[in-house]
Amino acid sequence: MSKFVFVTGGVVSSIGKGIVAASLGRLLKSRGYSVSILKLDPYLNVDPGTMSPFQHGEVFVTEDGAETDLDLGHYERFTDTAMTRLNSVTTGSIYQAVINKERRGSYNGGTVQVIPHITREIRERIHRVASNSNADIIITEIGGTVGDIESLPFLEAIREFKNDVNRNDVAYIHVTLLPYIKTSGEIKTKPTQHSVKELRSIGIQPDLLVCRSDKSINEGLKKKLSGFCGVNINSVIEALDADSIYSVPLSLKKEGLCKETLKYLELEDKECDLKNWEKLVHNLRNPGTPIKVALVGKYIELGDAYLSVVEALRHACIEQKALLDLHWVSAEMIEKDSAETYLNEVDAIVVPGGFGNRGVNGKISAIKFARENKIPFLGLCLGMQCAVIEWARNVANLPDASSSELDPKTPNPVIHLLPEQEDVVDLGGTMRLGVYPCRLTNNTIGKKLYDEDVIYERHRHRYEFNNYYKQSFLNSGYKISGTSPDGRLVELIELDNHPYFLACQYHPEFLSRPGKPHPLFKGLIKSSQENLTQSN
């Protein structure tokens, strides 16, 4: 029988609920409890798959092919547990399910309303995660801020939820902000008091308060919050701004978040083993030589658009005892100027995924610069497609080569639409999504890095390498180091006579973990370090 923890947020958005939920998951797992975490998002989109990266940040893809909120990436990285499509719920998906049931006559002619039908569907989704995961504890993060109209059905649903189970099977955590007023030199509790008041008016009494602040909270403030918010003083948890998200579990452990949560759930506070995590944070805080990595992207104005890529680079640098010196490079600026202007001093180049024409020629120029100047390079998804186009144009004597996505009339579509995508009309959830196997080729860098015959990686794309050109690429020196088991789809490519030049059609960043960096990212950083050693 699962226990349930609900995490809400107050005062401001982007308060860090996802990191708190993920950190609690890490702390519970370190005590031997199994955990699954789900996100309730209050927007009307069915999923974030068709949303602009500028609006929503990256789309995180689960093993079973769900396009989800980036917080699921935090959940997976912190708990080292794979989530599924059940772990991502939006208002759009809830309404879609309820309306479909109404059309099928599932409500026997009744009037369909927010209460009880929408809230019941939300509760059923939470129960479904519990039954499918068999986890000891289900943590649910409610997106948005208490007081938002959009969040009301979710808050009502989690209020009702305590009637589905025993009261000691549920704990409510409210993450809030304690602003520091510089002119008066005071930390203010009033916004938190009002946020809790709003939550109580819905019928939810928080059991724990996690108080975000950039100043330490003294005992007097904790007593004040305890009195006004009806929370035990030991359950007022200080969450100071951290130097890294990976240090948050350690600070919340020190504050007693996990211990207090287990008390409300009437579960044993088992011995906590965070030795590996402490080592990770130590290495993060005590890095070695800086590695200048250029991330050449289309959406660099919003760093969250490439969140998993950045974290994968960070994991690799921690493992290799290097300092990640990340350089954000606009692909469009390279088009206006030159690759040399922005990339001349970097130690490694990463070209991540994306969609559409904008900035593609800048990415291609960056890849050419990496190839010709022997700079370690890693291409991801569109990054691989751009690497293929660059080679075709500049080495394989196909100067008019392109992708049929970028130029439908190109005479040499070295990248083309997957055959199964040709009749697809809807955009949402229709790409090649989720985990697929890839067979690695012997005597390749890819095979050496993975040390496996078959790997499983997550995908999110419609376009692939055009096998019509495979032989001409092989003849001109390209190496295909990974394909689908039937050999039909090219998944991983590389070059000889280069320190490190690999590109993959999949998204390895989704499988990188703190303490377990992905082989392709680890290889990139290691190669960069070797280059630096040789040049010195």
Curated annotation (Swiss-Prot):
Domain of life: Bacteria
The protein's enzyme class: ligase
Keyword annotations from UniProtKB, A to Z: ATP-binding, Glutamine amidotransferase, Ligase, Magnesium, Metal-binding, Nucleotide-binding, Pyrimidine biosynthesis
Catalytic reactions on record: UTP + L-glutamine + ATP + H2O = CTP + L-glutamate + ADP + phosphate + 2 H(+); L-glutamine + H2O = L-glutamate + NH4(+); UTP + NH4(+) + ATP = CTP + ADP + phosphate + 2 H(+)
Region (Amidoligase domain): 1-267
Amino acids binding CTP: 13, 148-150, 188-193, 224
Record: residues binding Mg(2+): 71, 141
Coiled-coil portions: none
CDD domains: CTPS_N, GATase1_CTP_Synthase
Residue span, Glutamine amidotransferase type-1 domain: 292-534
GO molecular function: ATP binding; CTP synthase activity; glutaminase activity; identical protein binding; metal ion binding
Binding site for UTP: 13, 188-193, 224
Pathway note: Pyrimidine metabolism; CTP biosynthesis via de novo pathway; CTP from UDP: step 2/2
PROSITE patterns: GATASE_TYPE_1
Binding residue positions for L-glutamine: 354, 382-385, 405, 462
Transmembrane segments annotated in the record for this chain: none
Description of how activity is regulated: Allosterically activated by GTP, when glutamine is the substrate; GTP has no effect on the reaction when ammonia is the substrate. The allosteric effector GTP functions by stabilizing the protein conformation that binds the tetrahedral intermediate(s) formed during glutamine hydrolysis. Inhibited by the product CTP, via allosteric rather than competitive inhibition.
Amino acids binding ATP: 14-19, 71
Annotated EC: 6.3.4.2
Keyword Cytoplasm: no
Function in brief: Catalyzes the ATP-dependent amination of UTP to CTP with either L-glutamine or ammonia as the source of nitrogen. Regulates intracellular CTP levels through interactions with the four ribonucleotide triphosphates.
Additional remark text: CTPSs have evolved a hybrid strategy for distinguishing between UTP and CTP. The overlapping regions of the product feedback inhibitory and substrate sites recognize a common feature in both compounds, the triphosphate moiety. To differentiate isosteric substrate and product pyrimidine rings, an additional pocket far from the expected kinase/ligase catalytic site, specifically recognizes the cytosine and ribose portions of the product inhibitor.
HAMAP family referenced in this protein's UniProt entry, alphabetically: PyrG (MF_01227)
Subunit structure: Homotetramer.
Protein name per the record: CTP synthase
Lineage of producing organism: Bacteria, Bacillati, Cyanobacteriota, Cyanophyceae, Synechococcales
